[in-house]
């Protein structure tokens, strides 16, 4: 009997994310000397229904320490998983879910559980002498995703007047992933020059995800700057736009309205603004256009904006129960997949498969508080998702994901870039 895949050791520690806040890292070693490690990211604009990220709430690190989560791995999770076959990902994830005993992983912490879940997958892949994307996805994993690169920041990711959180570019006209990265990087540098000329050298500040955060005051002004950057780079026919509104962040539950640039708007009025934007600019996708609890509103905007990808992030939180409700109602037509919203690799894959089976697009995503861990790069190829959202072509925690995808594309030799078929790439 081959016991080389059996888990031999698990340990966790507190490390830092890209915002200088603590997060948790886990390491897993198998009997066959397979090694896996993982570092968990953290969000700024988080959905109400996300799994719970356990924080210490003590004096150190302003209450954001994760030593309790680290202790939960070392003292509770590890003893239960030692000796388990690392290939049994679903069994291992279920053991941790049952150990926690809550629907939202509030006892042990989704950050503790996810760190181990990801590290186990890596350890099993290493023991198998397989790259992680091939271990998770098999021989049919060959589609390289279209990157959604965040180049202009607003909302919680910046300090300007923009309420909408992310203005992104998608190089759907590229021939390969590496070509797509080049187009975006060139556009990013072009945009930097445009911003510097228009607002001054001090205006090329960047937000949490590497995008610029110039002092733009209106949505039209933001798109005007973006268009000029793309034009100067020479990619007007290759690059389109996508928007993350993060609308729950500017929604007022007391008045059931959205406060945009100081004006109070109804759901219908906000939808009209989106329709106007789509008519004026090459926008192909909008994420979280409305409040996270408004399934009816998502149904309406999906119907009104035919041909536009409407992505559910905060409304679905990578949770199959919430996604099923959306599918039944035709609310949105794509899922933003964030592994730390749900807390295990198995549940993340379940959500992606549910979305794909029902014709929903899948966008594998980072968080604003990221790390050098590039597991989402392998995951997007494993799932053939066709889309990845992981920030600007800047800051090491963002470029780590793009660089890993460049390596994967080179290793695959025969791959397919999703391009214009980004929503349903296979």
Curated annotation (Swiss-Prot):
It is found in: Cytoplasm; Secreted; Cell surface. Keywords: Cytoplasm, Glycolysis, Lyase, Magnesium, Metal-binding, Secreted. Mg(2+) binds at residues 244, 287, 313. (2R)-2-phosphoglycerate binds at residues 165, 338, 367-368, 389. Pathway: Carbohydrate degradation; glycolysis; pyruvate from D-glyceraldehyde 3-phosphate: step 4/5. The active site is at 209 (proton donor), 338 (proton acceptor). It catalyses: (2R)-2-phosphoglycerate = phosphoenolpyruvate + H2O. One of its GO terms (molecular function) is phosphopyruvate hydratase activity. PROSITE patterns: ENOLASE (PS00164). Its EC number is 4.2.1.11. One of its GO terms (biological process) is glycolytic process. It comes from the Archaea. It is an enzyme of class 4 (lyase). CDD domains: enolase (cd03313). Its main location: cytoplasm. GO terms for cellular component: cell surface; extracellular region; phosphopyruvate hydratase complex. Its cofactor is Mg(2+). HAMAP family: Enolase (MF_00318). Catalyzes the reversible conversion of 2-phosphoglycerate (2-PG) into phosphoenolpyruvate (PEP). It is essential for the degradation of carbohydrates via glycolysis. PANTHER family: ENOLASE. Belongs to the enolase family. This is Enolase. It comes from Methanococcus vannielii (strain ATCC 35089 / DSM 1224 / JCM 13029 / OCM 148 / SB).
């Amino acid at each position: 009997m081959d016991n080389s895949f059996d888990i031999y050791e698990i340990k966790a520690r507190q490390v830092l994310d890209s915002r200088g806040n603590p997060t948790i890292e886990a390491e897993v070693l198998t009997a066959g000397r397979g090694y896996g490690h993982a570092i968990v990211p953290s969000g700024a604009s988080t959905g109400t229904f996300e799994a719970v990220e356990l924080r210490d709430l003590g004096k150190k690190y302003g209450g954001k320490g994760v030593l309790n989560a680290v202790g939960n791995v070392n003292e509770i999770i590890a003893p239960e998983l030692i000796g388990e076959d690392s290939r049994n990902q679903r069994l291992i994830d279920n053991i941790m879910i049952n150990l926690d005993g809550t629907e939202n992983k509030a006892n042990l912490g989704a950050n503790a559980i996810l760190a181990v879940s990801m590290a186990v997958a890596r350890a099993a892949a290493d023991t198998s002498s397989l790259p992680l994307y091939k271990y998770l996805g098999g021989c049919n994993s060959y589609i390289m995703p279209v990157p959604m690169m965040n180049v202009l920041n607003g909302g919680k990711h910046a300090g300007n007047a923009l309420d909408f959180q992310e203005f992104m570019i998608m190089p759907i006209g590229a021939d390969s992933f590496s070509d797509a990265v080049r187009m975006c990087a060139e556009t990013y540098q072009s945009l930097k020059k445009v911003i510097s000329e228009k607002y001054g050298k001090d205006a090329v500040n960047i937000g949490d995800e590497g995008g610029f955060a110039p002092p733009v005051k209106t949505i039209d002004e933001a798109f005007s700057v973006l268009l000029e950057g793309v034009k100067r780079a020479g990619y007007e026919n290759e690059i389109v736009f996508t928007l993350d509104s993060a609308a729950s962040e500017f929604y007022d539950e007391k008045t059931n309205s959205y406060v945009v640039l100081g004006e109070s708007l109804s759901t219908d009025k906000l939808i009209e603004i989106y329709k106007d934007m789509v008519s004026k600019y090459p926008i192909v996708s909008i994420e979280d256009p409305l409040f996270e609890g408004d399934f009816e509103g998502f149904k309406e905007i999906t119907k009104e904006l035919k041909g536009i990808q409407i992505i559910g992030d905060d409304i679905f939180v990578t949770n199959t129960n919430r996604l099923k409700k959306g599918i039944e109602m035709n609310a949105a037509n794509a899922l933003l997949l964030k592994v730390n919203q749900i807390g295990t690799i198995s549940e993340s894959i379940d959500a992606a498969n549910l979305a794909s089976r029902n014709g929903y697009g899948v966008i594998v995503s980072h968080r604003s508080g990221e790390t050098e861990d590039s597991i989402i790069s392998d995951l997007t190829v494993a799932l053939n998702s066709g889309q990845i959202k992981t920030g600007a072509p800047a800051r090491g925690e963002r470029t780590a994901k793009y660089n890993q995808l460049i390596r994967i594309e080179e290793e695959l030799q025969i791959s397919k870039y999703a391009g214009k078929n980004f929503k349903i790439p296979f």
